[in-house]
Curated annotation (Swiss-Prot):
<feature type="binding site">
    <location>
        <position position="253"/>
    </location>
    <ligand>
        <name>Mg(2+)</name>
    </ligand>
</feature>
<keyword id="KW-0460">Magnesium</keyword>
<feature type="binding site">
    <location>
        <position position="143"/>
    </location>
    <ligand>
        <name>substrate</name>
    </ligand>
</feature>
<dbReference type="Pfam" id="PF13378">
    <property type="entry name" value="MR_MLE_C"/>
</dbReference>
<dbReference type="GO" id="GO:0016855">
    <property type="term" value="F:racemase and epimerase activity, acting on amino acids and derivatives"/>
</dbReference>
<dbReference type="InterPro" id="IPR034603">
    <property type="entry name" value="Dipeptide_epimerase"/>
</dbReference>
<feature type="binding site">
    <location>
        <begin position="168"/>
        <end position="170"/>
    </location>
    <ligand>
        <name>substrate</name>
    </ligand>
</feature>
<dbReference type="InterPro" id="IPR029065">
    <property type="entry name" value="Enolase_C-like"/>
</dbReference>
<feature type="binding site">
    <location>
        <position position="277"/>
    </location>
    <ligand>
        <name>substrate</name>
    </ligand>
</feature>
<comment type="similarity">
    <text>Belongs to the mandelate racemase/muconate lactonizing enzyme family.</text>
</comment>
<dbReference type="GO" id="GO:0000287">
    <property type="term" value="F:magnesium ion binding"/>
</dbReference>
<dbReference type="InterPro" id="IPR029017">
    <property type="entry name" value="Enolase-like_N"/>
</dbReference>
<keyword id="KW-0413">Isomerase</keyword>
<protein>
    <recommendedName>
        <fullName>Hydrophobic dipeptide epimerase</fullName>
        <ecNumber>5.1.1.-</ecNumber>
    </recommendedName>
</protein>
<dbReference type="InterPro" id="IPR013341">
    <property type="entry name" value="Mandelate_racemase_N_dom"/>
</dbReference>
<feature type="binding site">
    <location>
        <position position="225"/>
    </location>
    <ligand>
        <name>Mg(2+)</name>
    </ligand>
</feature>
<keyword id="KW-0479">Metal-binding</keyword>
Length: 368
């Protein structure tokens, strides 16, 4: 049950943070974190925080546009009494059409504030899908970004030594180099799960041929993420059909940014898994996608854009509350420098533990 609160102040601001190294994928790269943050404060001095991670090369959204939308929402919220945070989120949905990262930040801040006012952890806002209890401990994979063979080896060595058991390898620019990189990671961490993320970099035929080459070397990924362009539903279906009964799931990422997309993917048997991200759908619609997929026997990954500890920790709460995700890809803080890289519930081994979580998300970024 919600407790009413009055928002006295609301501010949106762009915050930047350096990366330890460029984050490269098939469709582009990040050289720094440049995200839009929202802070809502009640008349009693309680604050809630939200973050929009804008991935222009994937979604077409922009930082200036997202900032403007959140500034408009902040102006509308000042002085308002919120009786039900979820209803308040839905009232703003139309204003953020085409800007789901901005919507995610607004929802995050309102829900964070609501859970802080109520004195409950953020994960308590999300009822388990099938489990009886929240899942409060789990591990993320680590991403091996597009790069050289030596860089792939270095990442694999470092994170295998920390105890990571799943490596998500970005591919899609150079097939021969990609093959060598995947084999190198497998050689260094032979007992770890291999996830491939093509970020739309292949055709159906070239993807299946690539998988055959890996299989000939004894490497079979547990999951293949977005192998073809997002509107190539026939290509997704072809790959999924070819891999039915194999060890490899086919996961939609860019192809599924809404509940309607998820229905299409499921009804057409185009994929066997879906990657849910706050920045694609917003938080509330993301929960609807997860519930739909779980009800239809579709496996689930929870992912992130280039997000700081705020959004990553919010996603961890989301995963804990819904307790329906098979794969967790929430590793972006390991690529950041500075205080925005620190989540109180994530250790250096990639393990999240929310058993002792306090009210809200538990991360408070500094606003200038």
């Amino acid at each position: 049950m919600d407790i009413s609160f009055q928002i006295q102040d609301a501010v949106a601001s762009v915050i930047r943070a350096p990366l330890a190294s460029p984050f490269r994928i098939a469709t582009g790269q990040h050289d720094e974190l440049e995200n839009v943050f929202l802070k809502l404060t009640t008349r009693d001095g309680v604050s809630g925080y939200g973050e929009a991670a804008v991935a222009s090369h994937i979604t077409g959204e922009t930082v200036p546009g997202t900032l403007a939308n959140l500034q408009n929402a902040a102006a509308a919220l000042r002085g308002q009494t919120v009786d039900d945070a979820e209803s308040a989120c839905r009232q703003f949905a139309a204003a953020f059409a085409g800007n789901h990262a901005g919507l995610a930040a607004l929802e995050m801040a309102l829900l964070d504030l609501s859970s802080r006012v109520r004195g409950i952890p953020f994960y308590r806002l999300f009822a388990p899908v099938a489990a009886l209890e929240p899942r409060l401990a789990f591990s993320t994979d680590i991403t091996v970004v597009i790069g050289s063979l030596d860089e792939a080896r270095a990442t694999a060595r470092e994170f295998a030594s920390r105890g990571f058991k799943a490596f998500k390898i970005k591919i899609g620019r150079d097939e021969q180099l990609d093959l060598a990189r995947v084999l190198a990671v497998h050689e260094i961490a032979p007992d770890s799960q291999i996830i491939l993320d093509a970020n739309m970099g292949f055709s159906a035929g070239s993807m299946l041929a690539f998988l055959d080459r890996l299989a000939a070397k004894g490497v079979r990924p547990v999951l293949l993420e977005q192998p073809v362009p997002k509107m190539d539903w026939d290509g997704l279906s072809e790959i999924t059909a070819a891999l039915t009964g194999s060890e490899t799931l086919v996961c939609a990422d860019e192809s599924v940014g809404s509940l309607a997309d998820a229905r299409r993917a499921i009804d057409s048997n185009a994929v066997s898994a879906i990657n849910v991200k706050f920045m694609k759908s917003g938080i509330l619609e993301g929960a609807e996608i997860a519930r739909l997929a779980a009800s239809r026997g579709i496996r689930l990954m929870l992912g992130a854009m280039m997000e700081s500890a705020l959004a990553v920790t919010a996603s961890a709460h989301f995963a804990a509350g819904l307790a329906c995700f098979d794969y967790l890809d929430m590793d972006t803080t390991f690529f950041l420098k500075g205080e925005l890289a620190h989540s109180p519930y994530l250790d250096e081994h990639g393990r999240f533990d929310l058993h002792d979580a306090g009210p809200g998300i538990g991360v408070e970024p500094r606003f200038s």
